[in-house]
């Protein structure tokens, strides 16, 4: 047995021991404050608990308090301060019965690395955490909102230890934030890009007998409406425009109920104060994930790179509802998403070209054009890339392809800008 296993604090001392009652009281206040999101208060209570645990000689309590403090401070504190705190906790738990809780500290370190833009180092830290034995119960990290979900979401995106990560999420009922990826074990997944599909608990949701068309149309409308949903009156006007107002509102209520039954989870669809919405804590929607990615890739926001472009194309498997929805609201939303994919790929491609990675940019443009062969700006970008690579003949082939598609499908000529670019290629 390692010497540390015999340290005082292995068992709870009597509550009459100096500092014990104060430590437990502060710890309780810390947990409540952390779980309710009052983080400044949580930090104060945690520091008080740490001091009292040390006074009482409660080794395990002091270690847990340090883990909690590191997690609380991780989003905003200077890196040097956090690493010093984590290093001290690691040193204190080394060769003791608490050493397996280094898992939690490694995960906090990974969060800091992600925050600071060191994604490769974060991946290494998560892999080390997953290799620790025995397995930690992540108790203190589960007390702190955002930190643990963000780490687990990163691991899933990077395909690190997905089995263990998903097991933790399920075992400890960890809810993903709105930015959690598709790989998160969402209760409901709604796919609308490239066609419509539903999944529950990672299995395709199929229908026996008649397809519930109106509840599914309601769901598609709610996707178009975004996370805030729509007033019931607006839903009635869009789905039952020719029905008397009160009867149309009754139809909304009826089909909300039917949709919940279809999904198998009543809480997946929220209805409150005359407004209906998809619950983002229960449901993942591919179109919304794509929109968030597009928003983060705009000039002036996060730097667009090949990763962003690849992620966008992984999500954008085709146009919204694959052209099957011809209602005005579906057509409008489809157009919005098509503009997003063009803009996002352009931003990512421009970043690649700026770094001299013209071949990677050209591949990105080709992938996007395979999804939307009417996106004239992407033809131009691809032509620029090929010209930079000295492939003038290929660039002219791209122009002819663009001209043919626009003529056949839309009955129009390429823009003057595209024609001018082609003219420079012929010179």
Q: What are the residue ranges of the model-derived segments?
A:
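Ankyrin-repeat and related helical/solenoid repeat scaffolds used for protein-protein interactions
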Residues: 64-67, 80-134, 385-387
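A structural signal for the main folded, soluble domain(s) of proteins
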Residues: 18, 26-29, 33, 56, ...
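Helix-turn-helix repeat elements of alpha-solenoid scaffolds
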Residues: 1-9, 37-48, 77-88, 124-125, ...
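Intrinsically disordered, charged and Pro/Gly-enriched terminal/linker segments
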Residues: 59-62, 66, 71, 98-102, ...
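Short boundary/linker motifs that mark transitions into or out of structured domains
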Residues: 149, 153-216, 266-277, 318
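Amphipathic alpha-helical segments of tetratricopeptide repeats
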Residues: 7-18, 47-58, 87-95, 128-137, ...
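Extended amphipathic alpha-helical coiled-coil/heptad-repeat regions
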Residues: 1-9, 13-30
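DNA-recognition element of transcription regulators
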Residues: 210-220, 239, 244-264
């Amino acid at each position: 047995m390692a010497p540390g296993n015999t340290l005082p604090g292995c068992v709870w001392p009597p509550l009459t021991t100096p500092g014990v009652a104060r430590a437990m009281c502060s710890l309780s206040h810390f947990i409540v404050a952390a779980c309710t999101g009052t983080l400044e208060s949580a930090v104060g209570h945690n520091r008080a608990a740490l001091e009292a645990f040390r006074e009482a000689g409660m080794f395990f309590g002091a270690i847990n308090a340090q883990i909690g403090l590191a997690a609380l401070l991780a989003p905003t504190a200077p890196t040097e301060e956090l690493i010093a705190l984590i290093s001290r906790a690691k040193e204190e738990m080394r060769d003791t019965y608490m050493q397996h809780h280094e898992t939690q500290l490694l995960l906090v370190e990974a969060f800091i690395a992600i925050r600071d833009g060191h994604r490769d180092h974060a991946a290494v830290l998560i892999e080390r955490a997953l290799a620790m034995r025995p397995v930690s119960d992540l108790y203190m990290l589960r007390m702190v909102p955002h930190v643990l979900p963000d780490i687990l979401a990163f691991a899933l995106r990077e395909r690190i230890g997905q089995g263990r990560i998903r097991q933790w999420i399920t075992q400890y009922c960890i809810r993903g934030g709105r930015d959690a990826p598709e790989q998160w074990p969402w209760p409901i997944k709604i796919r609308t890009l490239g066609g419509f599909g539903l999944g529950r608990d990672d299995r395709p949701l199929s229908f026996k007998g008649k397809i519930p068309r109106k509840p599914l149309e309601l769901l598609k409308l709610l996707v178009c409406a975004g996370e805030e949903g729509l007033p019931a009156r607006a839903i009635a006007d869009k789905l039952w425009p020719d029905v008397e107002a009160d009867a149309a509102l009754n139809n909304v209520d009826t089909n909300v109920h039917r949709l919940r039954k279809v999904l198998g989870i009543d809480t997946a669809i929220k209805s409150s104060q005359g407004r209906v919405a998809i619950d983002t804590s229960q449901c993942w929607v591919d179109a919304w994930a794509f929109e968030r990615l597009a928003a983060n890739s705009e000039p002036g926001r996060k730097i667009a790179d090949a990763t962003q472009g690849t992620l966008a194309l992984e999500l954008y498997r085709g146009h919204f509802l694959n052209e099957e929805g011809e209602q005005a609201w579906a057509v409008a939303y489809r157009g919005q998403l098509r503009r997003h994919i063009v803009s996002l790929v352009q931003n990512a491609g421009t970043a690649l070209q700026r770094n001299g990675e013209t071949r990677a940019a050209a591949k990105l443009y080709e992938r996007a054009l395979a999804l939307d062969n009417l996106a004239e700006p992407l033809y131009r970008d691809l032509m620029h890339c090929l010209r930079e690579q000295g492939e003038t003949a290929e660039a002219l082939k791209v122009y002819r392809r663009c001209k043919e598609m626009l003529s056949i499908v839309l009955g129009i000529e390429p823009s003057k800008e595209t024609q001018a670019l082609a003219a420079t290629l012929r010179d």
